[in-house]
A protein has these predicted regions:
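Extracytoplasmic ligand/sensor domains, especially the bilobed periplasmic-binding protein
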Residues: 106-220, 270-297
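Short, polar/charged alpha-helical segment
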Residues: 45-67, 203-209
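Short, low-complexity disordered leader/linker segments with a strong preference
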Residues: 1-33, 101, 128, 429-432
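Segments of small-molecule ligand-sensing domains
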Residues: 323-337, 348-412, 417
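Hydrophobic alpha-helical
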Residues: 115-128, 204, 229-236, 241-265, ...
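Extracytoplasmic "Venus flytrap"
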Residues: 35-53, 79-86, 90, 190-199, ...
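Beta-alpha junction/loop-to-helix N-cap segments that form part of ligand/metal-binding clefts
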Residues: 29-31, 44-50, 65-148, 160, ...
């Protein structure tokens, strides 16, 4: 009886050890769980998730991440926070993140909340659990302020995409270039009545256009309700007042009507700003053309566009298209996807340099990041925001494209990577 019991226990032990062994006899390493949390039902969230999964597949094909003397595979767990959907409370998004951290034991959260309100609230959750979070969508500069005020609590949070301050700097830089290049002085502002547009346009007017040294005079400012389809009154007013440039800021699908009406009415003023709809290579075909001359901002290089000056932007696009098919997917905005892609590489490098999964040690290595990536040079400032500028050898970059009447898009800003000059609409002369 005792002999039989001993044999049974021995066989159970052998079976247990066998479960832990891989095919080559090595102990199977426990995977590192990478959590992807955002509004994954939207195109931007979905594409960001796809980009990260592509990197995870690549890393796992090489055996995983090297942690000290061992290799650890990666496992992706996802949660759709739905925080970009109307009526979804921030508390629901936080609950989803907490389930990922506690239930799925996520080591790090990538992409992160879509809305700035959800991001700021989630930082306390990240601090509580000491989980790394590398952001690539939400843009509020208040993230950096929180890190500056309480570094020890919030040091686990980093952002790779541009923030709203960077956004305004690019708009100001573009208009400074336009003013210098064409000797223009008169601008008219057209924006939708959304939180995004108000948060961007009001500081831009107050802190740039209305400053004497900007060289610009604001001839008028029209705010249209969300969902508006007729923008003719604002366009006619801009024409009547002699505006030489139209700053447009929209993020809703109806914004395409503003650009098309500008074109069909033959308004003799440059159309330059942000819609998010006119940036992809497929936009001309999908939207029926009719917006040649319009300029739009792509918030980070690599989001559907690449240049030889930034080799990894072309490499990323090539890999993405081979893996998932033509860009874009699901109407994604030109924002966040390339930063999400780079976030997984940055996390991998930091873990391998630290030689441990201790979050404090990995934070120190992320802070030292200095790599050439899909957006240009990637470095973090002291408050964990990636540095953006106009020279990809020194910083990550956003780009402004202008559509030509033959349906081709051309990078016109910043000058360091421009592929053509800004073309003026018919009837608009320089320096008038």
């Amino acid at each position: 009886m005792k002999k039989g019991l001993f044999i049974s226990i021995f066989m159970l032990a052998v079976t247990y050890v066998g479960v832990l062994l891989t095919g080559n006899g090595a102990i199977a390493a426990e995977p590192i769980v990478i959590g992807i949390a955002s509004s994954l039902g939207l195109g931007t969230g979905q594409q960001s998730m796809d980009a990260i999964k592509m990197v995870v597949e690549e890393i796992n094909s090489r055996g995983g991440i090297t942690v000290g003397s061992s290799k650890r595979p990666l496992k992706v767990e996802t949660v759709d926070l739905r925080d970009a959907e109307p009526g979804v409370p921030v508390t629901e998004a936080l609950l989803g993140m907490e389930k990922l951290i506690i239930g799925k034991k996520a080591y790090a959260i990538l992409v992160g909340p879509y809305r700035s309100e959800a991001l700021l609230a989630s930082m306390d959750l990240i601090a509580k659990h000491k989980v790394l979070m590398l952001l690539s969508i939400a843009m509020t500069p208040e993230m950096e302020n929180k890190i500056q005020k309480d570094y020890e609590s919030y040091k686990y949070v980093f952002r790779l995409c541009i923030n709203s301050k960077n956004f305004m700097e690019y708009m100001a830089g573009l208009y400074t270039y336009i003013g210098s290049e064409f000797k223009f002085k008169r601008v008219y502002v057209l924006n939708e009545d959304s939180g995004f547009s108000r948060a961007a346009v009001n500081p831009l007017i107050a802190n740039y256009f209305e400053k004497p040294d900007s060289g610009w005079t604001v001839m008028g400012h029209r705010t249209f309700p969300i969902g508006a389809t007729d923008y003719t009154t604002g366009l006619m007013d801009a024409q009547m007042k002699g505006a030489q440039a139209l700053l447009m800021l929209t993020s809703m699908p109806q914004g395409i009507n503003l650009v098309k009406q500008w074109k069909s009415m033959k308004i003799s003023a440059l159309m330059a700003g942000y819609t998010g709809l006119l940036t992809t290579e497929e936009a001309w075909k999908e939207l029926g053309g009719g917006f040649g001359g319009a300029m739009d901002l792509i918030m980070e290089m690599g989001n559907g566009i690449g240049v030889k000056e930034i080799p990894r932007s072309l490499e990323f696009l090539d890999k993405y298209v081979k893996r998932y098919g033509p860009w874009p997917k699901g109407g994604a905005m030109p924002h966040g996807i390339a930063p999400a892609y780079e976030s997984m590489y940055i996390l991998q490098e930091a873990i391998e340099k630290a030689g441990t999964l201790d979050p404090d040690a990995v934070v120190k290595e992320i802070e030292k990041t200095d790599r050439m990536g899909a957006m240009g040079r990637i470095r973090f400032d002291k408050n964990h925001q990636v540095v953006y500028g106009v020279d990809p050898q020194k910083a990550s970059v956003a780009v402004v494209i202008q559509w030509r009447d033959d349906g081709q898009r051309v990078i016109v800003f910043p000058e360091s990577i421009a592929k053509g000059k800004i073309e003026l609409p018919a009837g608009l002369k320089t320096g008038r």
